[in-house]
Amino acid sequence: MAAGSVESQRSQAASERPVAGQAGVLPCLELPSYAAACALVGSRYSCLVAAPHRRHIALSPRYLSRKRTGIREQLDAELLRYSESLLGVPIAYDNIRVVGELGDIYDDQGHIHLNIEADFVIFCPEPGQTLMGTVNKVSSSHIGCLVHGCFNASIPKPEQMSYEEWQTLEIHVGDELEFDVFRLDSDSAGVFCIRGKLSTTSLQLKHSAVSEDVAETVVEEVVEKTPKKKKKKKDKDTDTCGTVDSVTEVADVTDVTPQEETDIPCSDNVNDFFEEEPKKKKKKKKRHQEDQDPIFQASDSSGYQSDHNKKKKKRKHSEEANFESPKKRQ
């Protein structure tokens, strides 16, 4: 019973334990097929190389009857990880060929050693080269890109660039971005990571695109604003004309109303009404004469002109006439 229980526990552990080759594949990244990878080789800034390579593989004894499956599991586990023998990172392979008819067993080791050949597509960038990536993250400190759909690249904000300038680049998720390779890193598991920096061409393109957008918006605003200003001027002219007309109408009304009121007698007696009419006529005649024959009025020392001297002269003439008339009678 104890032996049976131990064997059952071992079988459960073996079933729960993941396969070595499957554990090596990164599930979060999309691996391209060999045909898709070969199509990317000819693209600009790909840094991909397609070439055949020979590899040494230690095959487990359990794969003696299915050698191709064992070889594929080992090669799949090495994808997207830096390989010193390949001097790069393999992303796809095809056309596996076993070199030699027999394998080798060394000493008391249970693995069978084989040499194989396969066509690999290798990603081998170097510092200073230019890459093309798809933006998948934009933050205030860096930009994240995905190269060939499977390699992460981080582009930090330059130290000499201000936060406002960094925001004016207008880089959005999904945009294609060119950058220069600054450094290549890999962690303890061999996961490949790229450190990059913005290239001068990408900065110039972004700045030119931003300047063109700004120029277009300014032109559109000017075109939209100019007819509005003309309308405002027309409205102002119409308003001024309306105000002038209203002012003239008000002036006419004010000129008419006092005349009508002055012509109406204020007294209740009829005699007063008839007495006031000749006085008004005399006043009108005097005004008419003064308008035709201007008289220079006397002025005081202060410069104020008055009719008081004229009245005095008239009184003197009347008194002299009255004084001479009784003498003549005598």
Curated annotation (Swiss-Prot):
It is found in: Nucleus, Nucleolus. Gene3D superfamilies: 2.40.50.1060, RNA polymerase Rpb7-like, N-terminal domain. It comes from the Eukaryota. Pfam families: RPA43_OB, SHS2_Rpb7-N. Residues 317-330 have a biased composition (Basic and acidic residues). Keywords: DNA-directed RNA polymerase, Nucleus, Phosphoprotein, Transcription. InterPro entries: RNA_pol_Rpb7-like_N_sf, RNAP_I_Rpa43_N, RPA43_OB, Rpb7-like, Rpb7-like_N. One of its GO terms (biological process) is cellular response to leukemia inhibitory factor. Residues 251-330 are annotated as: Disordered. Belongs to the eukaryotic RPA43 RNA polymerase subunit family. Component of RNA polymerase I (Pol I), a DNA-dependent RNA polymerase which synthesizes ribosomal RNA precursors using the four ribonucleoside triphosphates as substrates. Through its association with RRN3/TIF-IA may be involved in recruitment of Pol I to rDNA promoters. This is DNA-directed RNA polymerase I subunit RPA43. It comes from Mus musculus. The gene is Polr1f.
